[in-house]
Protein backbone atom coordinates (compact mmCIF):
# COMPACT_ATOMS: atom_id res chain seq x y z
CA UNK A 1 0.00 0.00 0.00
CA UNK A 2 1.41 3.38 -1.01
CA UNK A 3 2.01 6.03 1.67
CA UNK A 4 -0.70 8.64 2.00
CA UNK A 5 -0.05 12.14 0.67
CA UNK A 6 1.33 14.96 2.76
CA UNK A 7 1.44 18.71 2.17
CA UNK A 8 5.18 19.13 2.84
CA UNK A 9 7.10 21.25 0.36
CA UNK A 10 9.99 19.58 -1.45
CA UNK A 11 13.20 20.67 0.29
CA UNK A 12 16.71 19.36 -0.48
CA UNK A 13 17.93 16.88 2.13
CA UNK A 14 20.94 19.05 2.95
CA UNK A 15 18.70 21.99 3.82
CA UNK A 16 16.36 19.78 5.86
CA UNK A 17 19.28 18.62 7.95
CA UNK A 18 20.51 22.18 8.45
CA UNK A 19 17.08 23.39 9.57
CA UNK A 20 16.72 20.47 11.97
CA UNK A 21 20.17 21.00 13.48
CA UNK A 22 19.41 24.67 14.06
CA UNK A 23 16.11 23.77 15.75
CA UNK A 24 17.75 21.08 17.86
CA UNK A 25 20.54 23.40 18.97
CA UNK A 26 17.98 26.07 19.84
CA UNK A 27 16.01 23.58 21.96
CA UNK A 28 18.99 22.55 24.07
CA UNK A 29 20.48 26.03 24.41
CA UNK A 30 17.03 27.36 25.40
CA UNK A 31 16.69 24.83 28.21
CA UNK A 32 20.26 25.31 29.33
CA UNK A 33 19.47 29.00 29.83
CA UNK A 34 16.10 28.30 31.43
CA UNK A 35 17.50 25.93 34.04
CA UNK A 36 20.70 27.79 34.80
CA UNK A 37 20.52 28.66 38.51
CA UNK A 38 22.69 31.73 38.02
CA UNK A 39 20.55 33.23 35.26
CA UNK A 40 17.30 32.43 37.11
CA UNK A 41 15.04 32.59 34.07
CA UNK A 42 12.60 30.33 35.91
CA UNK A 43 11.88 32.61 38.85
CA UNK A 44 8.19 32.75 37.85
CA UNK A 45 7.48 29.34 36.30
CA UNK A 46 3.69 29.70 36.35
CA UNK A 47 3.91 32.40 33.71
CA UNK A 48 6.13 30.36 31.40
CA UNK A 49 5.38 26.65 31.58
CA UNK A 50 2.50 26.38 29.12
CA UNK A 51 4.25 28.36 26.38
CA UNK A 52 7.54 26.57 27.06
CA UNK A 53 5.80 23.22 26.60
CA UNK A 54 4.72 24.36 23.15
CA UNK A 55 8.27 25.54 22.44
CA UNK A 56 9.30 21.90 22.93
CA UNK A 57 6.43 20.69 20.76
CA UNK A 58 7.48 22.95 17.90
CA UNK A 59 10.88 21.25 17.99
CA UNK A 60 9.04 17.91 17.76
CA UNK A 61 7.02 19.10 14.77
CA UNK A 62 10.19 20.15 12.94
CA UNK A 63 12.00 16.89 13.71
CA UNK A 64 8.98 14.92 12.47
CA UNK A 65 8.79 16.86 9.23
CA UNK A 66 12.45 16.19 8.47
CA UNK A 67 12.50 12.57 9.59
CA UNK A 68 14.80 13.14 12.58
CA UNK A 69 12.76 10.97 14.93
CA UNK A 70 15.69 10.08 17.18
CA UNK A 71 15.55 13.60 18.65
CA UNK A 72 11.81 13.65 19.34
CA UNK A 73 11.57 11.68 22.63
CA UNK A 74 13.57 14.39 24.42
CA UNK A 75 11.27 17.12 23.09
CA UNK A 76 8.15 15.21 24.10
CA UNK A 77 9.53 14.36 27.54
CA UNK A 78 10.18 18.04 28.29
CA UNK A 79 6.76 19.11 26.97
CA UNK A 80 4.94 16.55 29.10
CA UNK A 81 6.98 17.41 32.19
CA UNK A 82 5.73 20.98 31.87
CA UNK A 83 2.16 20.03 30.97
CA UNK A 84 1.90 17.75 34.00
CA UNK A 85 2.90 20.73 36.12
CA UNK A 86 0.50 23.10 34.35
CA UNK A 87 -2.56 20.93 34.94
CA UNK A 88 -1.49 19.93 38.45
CA UNK A 89 -1.33 23.62 39.39
CA UNK A 90 -4.57 24.44 37.55
CA UNK A 91 -6.45 21.65 39.33
CA UNK A 92 -5.19 22.70 42.77
CA UNK A 93 -6.08 26.36 42.80
CA UNK A 94 -5.12 28.20 46.01
CA UNK A 95 -3.17 25.19 47.30
CA UNK A 96 0.61 24.94 47.63
CA UNK A 97 1.95 22.56 44.98
CA UNK A 98 5.45 21.04 44.84
CA UNK A 99 6.80 20.35 41.35
CA UNK A 100 10.01 20.16 39.33
CA UNK A 101 11.31 21.47 36.01
CA UNK A 102 14.48 19.62 35.12
CA UNK A 103 16.74 19.57 38.17
CA UNK A 104 15.04 22.59 39.75
CA UNK A 105 12.32 22.24 42.37
CA UNK A 106 9.52 24.71 43.04
CA UNK A 107 6.77 25.36 45.54
CA UNK A 108 3.98 27.54 44.17
CA UNK A 109 0.33 28.28 44.90
CA UNK A 110 -1.90 26.66 42.29
CA UNK A 111 -3.89 28.88 39.96
CA UNK A 112 -6.60 27.98 37.45
CA UNK A 113 -5.27 30.52 34.97
CA UNK A 114 -2.02 28.54 34.53
CA UNK A 115 -3.84 26.34 31.98
CA UNK A 116 -6.20 28.66 30.13
CA UNK A 117 -5.33 27.46 26.62
CA UNK A 118 -7.69 27.03 23.70
CA UNK A 119 -9.81 23.93 23.24
CA UNK A 120 -7.63 22.99 20.24
CA UNK A 121 -4.41 23.17 22.28
CA UNK A 122 -6.01 21.25 25.18
CA UNK A 123 -7.05 18.46 22.81
CA UNK A 124 -3.59 18.29 21.23
CA UNK A 125 -2.03 18.11 24.70
CA UNK A 126 -4.32 15.26 25.74
CA UNK A 127 -3.51 13.35 22.57
CA UNK A 128 0.22 13.91 23.00
CA UNK A 129 -0.05 12.46 26.52
CA UNK A 130 -2.06 9.51 25.15
CA UNK A 131 0.57 8.82 22.50
CA UNK A 132 3.32 8.96 25.13
CA UNK A 133 1.25 6.71 27.44
CA UNK A 134 1.34 9.36 30.16
CA UNK A 135 -2.00 8.52 31.72
CA UNK A 136 -1.40 10.63 34.80
CA UNK A 137 -1.21 13.67 32.56
CA UNK A 138 -4.34 12.62 30.67
CA UNK A 139 -6.19 12.32 33.97
CA UNK A 140 -5.05 15.78 35.10
CA UNK A 141 -6.24 17.24 31.80
CA UNK A 142 -9.66 15.58 31.86
CA UNK A 143 -10.75 15.86 35.51
CA UNK A 144 -10.93 19.64 35.22
CA UNK A 145 -14.09 21.47 34.26
CA UNK A 146 -14.37 23.27 30.95
CA UNK A 147 -13.86 26.68 32.56
CA UNK A 148 -10.11 25.97 32.51
CA UNK A 149 -10.19 26.06 28.70
CA UNK A 150 -10.80 29.16 26.61
CA UNK A 151 -13.98 28.30 24.71
CA UNK A 152 -14.98 30.17 21.57
CA UNK A 153 -18.42 28.76 20.83
CA UNK A 154 -20.99 26.05 21.73
CA UNK A 155 -19.07 23.49 19.68
CA UNK A 156 -15.99 23.92 21.88
CA UNK A 157 -18.11 23.37 25.00
CA UNK A 158 -19.73 20.27 23.50
CA UNK A 159 -16.44 18.70 22.42
CA UNK A 160 -14.76 19.31 25.79
CA UNK A 161 -17.74 17.72 27.56
CA UNK A 162 -17.65 14.74 25.18
CA UNK A 163 -13.92 14.10 25.63
CA UNK A 164 -14.17 14.48 29.40
CA UNK A 165 -17.16 12.14 29.28
CA UNK A 166 -15.16 9.48 27.47
CA UNK A 167 -12.37 9.52 30.04
CA UNK A 168 -14.84 9.82 32.91
CA UNK A 169 -16.82 6.78 31.68
CA UNK A 170 -19.98 8.87 31.41
CA UNK A 171 -23.22 7.00 30.81
CA UNK A 172 -24.41 9.98 28.74
CA UNK A 173 -21.92 9.56 25.85
CA UNK A 174 -24.62 9.13 23.16
CA UNK A 175 -26.24 12.41 24.21
CA UNK A 176 -22.86 14.17 24.46
CA UNK A 177 -21.93 12.93 20.98
CA UNK A 178 -25.25 14.10 19.57
CA UNK A 179 -24.62 17.56 21.03
CA UNK A 180 -21.16 17.69 19.41
CA UNK A 181 -22.67 16.93 16.02
CA UNK A 182 -25.49 19.43 16.48
CA UNK A 183 -23.14 22.22 17.57
CA UNK A 184 -20.86 21.59 14.58
CA UNK A 185 -23.56 23.07 12.37
CA UNK A 186 -22.48 26.35 10.70
CA UNK A 187 -25.22 28.21 12.57
CA UNK A 188 -23.22 27.77 15.81
CA UNK A 189 -19.82 28.65 14.32
CA UNK A 190 -18.11 31.73 13.00
CA UNK A 191 -17.73 31.38 9.24
CA UNK A 192 -13.94 31.12 9.50
CA UNK A 193 -14.28 28.24 11.96
CA UNK A 194 -16.46 26.03 9.76
CA UNK A 195 -13.67 24.48 7.63
CA UNK A 196 -11.44 24.17 10.70
CA UNK A 197 -14.06 22.27 12.69
CA UNK A 198 -15.11 20.02 9.82
CA UNK A 199 -11.57 19.28 8.63
CA UNK A 200 -9.89 18.59 11.97
CA UNK A 201 -12.39 18.08 14.79
CA UNK A 202 -15.31 16.14 13.31
CA UNK A 203 -12.93 13.62 11.68
CA UNK A 204 -11.24 13.28 15.09
CA UNK A 205 -14.61 12.55 16.69
CA UNK A 206 -15.45 9.95 14.03
CA UNK A 207 -12.19 8.10 14.71
CA UNK A 208 -12.77 8.31 18.47
CA UNK A 209 -16.28 6.86 18.11
CA UNK A 210 -14.94 3.92 16.09
CA UNK A 211 -12.47 3.15 18.89
CA UNK A 212 -15.18 3.45 21.55
CA UNK A 213 -17.39 1.08 19.53
CA UNK A 214 -14.52 -1.37 18.88
CA UNK A 215 -15.30 -1.30 15.14
CA UNK A 216 -12.04 -1.80 13.21
CA UNK A 217 -13.56 -1.40 9.75
CA UNK A 218 -15.09 1.92 10.78
CA UNK A 219 -11.81 2.92 12.43
CA UNK A 220 -9.67 2.29 9.36
CA UNK A 221 -12.12 4.15 7.12
CA UNK A 222 -12.52 7.06 9.55
CA UNK A 223 -8.75 7.30 10.07
CA UNK A 224 -8.03 7.47 6.35
CA UNK A 225 -10.78 10.06 5.90
CA UNK A 226 -9.35 12.09 8.79
CA UNK A 227 -5.82 11.95 7.35
CA UNK A 228 -7.11 13.06 3.96
CA UNK A 229 -9.01 15.93 5.63
CA UNK A 230 -5.83 16.93 7.49
CA UNK A 231 -3.90 16.91 4.22
CA UNK A 232 -6.52 18.99 2.40
CA UNK A 233 -6.75 21.50 5.25
CA UNK A 234 -3.00 22.08 5.41
CA UNK A 235 -2.72 22.41 1.64
CA UNK A 236 -4.36 25.80 2.18
CA UNK A 237 -1.73 28.53 1.85
CA UNK A 238 -2.99 30.27 5.01
CA UNK A 239 -1.90 27.34 7.19
CA UNK A 240 0.53 25.38 5.03
CA UNK A 241 3.55 26.59 6.97
CA UNK A 242 2.04 26.00 10.41
CA UNK A 243 4.28 23.59 12.37
CA UNK A 244 1.18 21.95 13.86
CA UNK A 245 0.32 20.57 10.45
CA UNK A 246 3.48 18.47 10.31
CA UNK A 247 1.99 15.86 12.65
CA UNK A 248 -1.63 15.30 13.61
CA UNK A 249 -1.32 15.05 17.38
CA UNK A 250 -5.05 14.40 17.64
CA UNK A 251 -4.97 11.38 15.34
CA UNK A 252 -1.63 10.15 16.69
CA UNK A 253 -3.07 9.98 20.20
CA UNK A 254 -6.14 8.11 19.02
CA UNK A 255 -4.05 5.73 16.90
CA UNK A 256 -1.89 4.92 19.94
CA UNK A 257 -5.02 4.25 21.98
CA UNK A 258 -6.43 1.97 19.26
CA UNK A 259 -3.14 0.11 18.98
CA UNK A 260 -2.86 -0.48 22.72
CA UNK A 261 -6.52 -1.45 23.10
CA UNK A 262 -7.03 -3.59 20.00
CA UNK A 263 -3.70 -3.93 18.17
CA UNK A 264 -5.06 -1.94 15.21
CA UNK A 265 -2.38 -0.68 12.85
CA UNK A 266 -2.09 2.54 10.85
CA UNK A 267 -1.45 3.41 7.20
CA UNK A 268 1.92 4.72 6.05
CA UNK A 269 1.77 8.49 6.52
CA UNK A 270 4.06 11.29 7.67
CA UNK A 271 1.25 12.68 9.82
CA UNK A 272 1.31 9.70 12.23
CA UNK A 273 4.79 8.88 13.58
CA UNK A 274 4.80 5.08 13.74
CA UNK A 275 7.37 4.96 16.53
CA UNK A 276 5.05 7.03 18.71
CA UNK A 277 1.84 5.20 17.81
CA UNK A 278 3.45 1.81 18.45
CA UNK A 279 5.17 2.88 21.68
CA UNK A 280 8.74 2.59 20.40
CA UNK A 281 10.06 5.78 22.01
CA UNK A 282 12.97 4.07 23.75
CA UNK A 283 14.17 2.35 20.59
CA UNK A 284 13.76 5.55 18.58
CA UNK A 285 15.98 7.57 20.91
CA UNK A 286 18.90 5.14 20.75
Q: Residues of each region from the PLM?
A:
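Alpha-helical oligomerization segments
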Residues: 214-286
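Intrinsically disordered, low-structural-confidence terminal and linker regions
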Residues: 1-10
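Eukaryote-skewed repeat-based solenoidal scaffolds used as protein-protein interaction platforms
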Residues: 12-227
Amino acid sequence: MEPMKNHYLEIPEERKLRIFREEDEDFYSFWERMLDDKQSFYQQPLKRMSSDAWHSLHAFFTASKYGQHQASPAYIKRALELLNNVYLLANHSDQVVEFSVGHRHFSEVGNRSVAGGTMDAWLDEICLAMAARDWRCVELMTIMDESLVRLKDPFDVALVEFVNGVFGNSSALPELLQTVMEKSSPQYLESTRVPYVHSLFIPFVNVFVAIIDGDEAHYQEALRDALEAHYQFYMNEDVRYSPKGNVSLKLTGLAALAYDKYGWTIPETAYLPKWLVYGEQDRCSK
